[in-house]
Amino acid sequence: MMELQDHFLIAMPQMEDDYFAHSVVYICEHNDQGTMGLVLNQPTDLSIAELCAKMNFMMKTDRTYGNDLVLAGGPVNIERGFILHTKTAQTFKHSYKVTDQLSLTTSADIIDTFGTAQAPEKYLVALGCASWTVNQLESEIANNDWLVVPANNRILFDVPYEDRWLEANLLLGIQHHNFAHQAGHC
């Protein structure tokens, strides 16, 4: 089985699926039950500050929120929030350790830390996720739908949303204009 956890999936330019065209997906979990990830470059119109206000967390004083947008993390469980974040001293109710430095949290207790010193140093918030059944993603990779590259935190948290696809390709040393529109197999 391929090891895909903590990797980026980079949609090939010829990807025909409207949802995933030109997308970068961070793989949070990959095991013998399937694969789950978050699309990193499809921001919604909702800011994290607005999300906190809707959840009544902004009623607390002394909080500052950045202007980051909530991501459309994928077409599955679109009403559910997923927070990918750097390691914190605090533990949260529903967290999954992705790497030694990154966790995925789905419980609202993490949102209560936003705007405080207890918040993770870096985080992104997504509504929905992408998921694949066992061997489905490996089949899509074999069909040249995706490129795979080890993830890095700069692209995860610091690169503007609209530049993430190009930046992820650069991790492989590929300029987008060098892509062939067909792939061949020997």
Curated annotation (Swiss-Prot):
Stored InterPro entries: AlgH-like
Classification via Pfam families: DUF179
Any Gene Ontology CC annotation: cytosol
Sequence similarity: Belongs to the UPF0301 (AlgH) family.
Protein name (database record): UPF0301 protein PM1869
Organism phylogeny: Bacteria, Pseudomonadati, Pseudomonadota, Gammaproteobacteria, Pasteurellales
